[in-house]
Amino acid sequence: AFLYAVPYEMYEKYHVRRYGFHGISHKYVDERTRRHFNNPHLKNITLHLGNGASMAAVDAQGHCIDTSMGFGPNEGLLMGSRCGDIDSAVVFFLGKKGLSNDEIAEIFNHESGMKGITGSSDARDVEALAEKGDPNGILCLDMYAYRVKKYIGAYAAALNGVDTLIFTAGLGENASIIRQLVCEDLEYLGVKIDAEKNKSLNHPSDIVEIQAPDSKVK
């Protein structure tokens, strides 16, 4: 999972590979969850959803087998000002349009994501726009949740099943609408969220379970 399909010498010579980020956060919430359920053999998907965002798949032995960020922190999820996954052809296209590498990097890392779609990198502003019916605010939340769902599906396949979805960081802990949108239509995976528990959760100081009583996934 850590290798890119580029000439292997790029890895040997320049160490071009996927590294991932937010490792301390992913490791901490994974270990806390195993202790919380008194089960060291859980298959966990950890979701560090903040202004920067990443996910990780942790197998039943506690090994992280995949993570959404790669060589740099721009790969993967839609973020506050980062675009996340994007076709490399866009880089070449913008270069032909006269933009420098530094200008493209600035756009992808500081002018994209939520900021690029709504004008603000603050998820609270995006939520407020969506609540008012602003099309771009609604679009942004839908795009955000869709990207997260894609990774949940991919990681569930890589893990051969999933026992828990673990939300952490600013949006993961405090944005009930994000958790709701992410968990919607995941019943086929055994994910059922308790709407009332989810809405009432705010600034938790410890692990809080928000699954419905009949949810197979915690």
Would you name each region that the model predicts?
Residues 25, 29, 54, 87-90, ...:
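General structural feature for long, well-ordered alpha-helical segments within catalytic domains
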Residues 61-62, 108, 148, 167:
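Buried hydrophobic positions in well-ordered alpha/beta secondary-structure cores of metabolic enzymes
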Residues 43-47, 103-111, 164-166:
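Beta-strand segments within the central parallel beta-sheet cores of soluble alpha/beta enzyme folds
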Residues 47, 67, 168, 194-196:
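Generic beta-strand/beta-sheet core signal
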Residues 138, 142-162, 172-218:
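Internal helix-turn-beta structural module
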Residues 97-140:
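A mobile "lid/hinge" subdomain adjacent to the ATP/sugar-phosphate binding pocket shared
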Residues 2-96:
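Glycine-rich phosphate-binding loop of actin/hexokinase-like ATP-binding domains
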Residues 49, 166-174:
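Glycine-rich beta-strand-to-loop/alpha-helix junction loops that act as flexible
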